[in-house]
């Protein structure tokens, strides 16, 4: 999958080095080994993981700002897309937000093993993090397999600074999900979403939803943990 990685990075003007490759492969080693005892990913085949994890993460590169910026990966789980992006973009200051203790423990060990000095771990829910110092502090917030758009935007947009963006990695139901969220996004300070279709070998209906942050989020959002799931905004 070396050619695929080079192609995806090249689309953002990035030349992958031997060190990039070594760290990306080492990350996959750690992820797949830990997955034997912790439920981190449904992808267990190495080649599929090279596409579905590393390749998937690298599709976000063209949407990241040039130069140093702050990025939060909400519900980071096994570390995708946050860790691959941190490896390839060492000028990005990446925060992995994960509330599940076992997953957070894996992320902490992986950050240390890969010596990723530009990565920090927040063991917290996005709703709680967004009511603290992290509120509206990130240029980019990413989310992959975290929840439907009507929930995702309440959890994530309060973390994005005005002028920044939310990048949500979605699948076949994206149009339906956006229809459910179209009145919610402006309430949270979001602008008009853009849908970017991405082609990855062996995958279908892969899209990146880009939502700009155009105004501050009202202080009442996000609501306390679990409330969004029980009573989604409309």
Predicted regions and their residues:
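Helix-to-beta-strand junctions that scaffold the AdoMet/dcAdoMet cofactor pocket
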Residues: 89, 160-162
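Short "lid" loop at the C-terminus of a central beta-strand within the Rossmann-like core
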Residues: 127, 148, 171-175, 199
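Short alpha-helix immediately C-terminal to the canonical SAM-binding loop
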Residues: 103-105, 174, 178
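Residue-level signal for inorganic ion chemistry
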Residues: 31, 85, 170, 211
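Conserved SAM/SAH cofactor-binding pocket of Class I
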Residues: 55-147, 153
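Conserved beta-strand signature within the Rossmann-like core of class I S-adenosyl-L-methionine
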Residues: 163-173
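SAM/dcSAM-binding transferase cores
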Residues: 179-234
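Class I SAM-dependent transferase core
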Residues: 1-72, 102-122, 226
């Amino acid at each position: 999958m070396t050619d695929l990685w080079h192609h995806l990075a090249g689309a953002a003007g990035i030349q992958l080095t031997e060190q990039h490759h070594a760290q990306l492969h080492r990350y996959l080693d750690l992820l797949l080994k830990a997955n034997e005892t912790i439920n981190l990913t449904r992808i267990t085949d190495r080649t599929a993981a090279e596409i579905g994890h590393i390749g998937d993460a690298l599709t976000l590169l063209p949407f990241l700002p040039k130069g140093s910026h702050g990025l939060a990966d909400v519900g980071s789980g096994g570390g995708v897309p946050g860790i691959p992006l941190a490896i390839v973009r060492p000028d990005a200051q990446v925060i992995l937000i994960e509330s599940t203790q076992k997953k957070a423990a894996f992320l902490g060990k992986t950050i240390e093993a890969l010596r990723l000095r530009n990565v920090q771990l927040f063991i917290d829910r996005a709703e709680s993090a967004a009511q603290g110092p992290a509120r509206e502090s990130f240029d980019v917030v990413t989310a992959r397999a975290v929840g439907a758009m009507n929930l995702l935007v309440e959890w994530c947009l309060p973390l994005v600074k005005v002028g920044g963006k939310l990048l949500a990695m979605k699948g076949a139901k994206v149009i339906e999900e956006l229809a459910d969220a179209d009145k919610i996004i402006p309430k949270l300070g979001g602008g008009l979403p853009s849908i970017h279709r991405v082609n990855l070998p062996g995958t279908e209906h892969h899209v990146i939803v880009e939502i700009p942050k155009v105004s501050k989020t009202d202080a009442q959002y996000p609501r306390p943990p679990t409330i969004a799931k029980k009573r989604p905004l409309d």
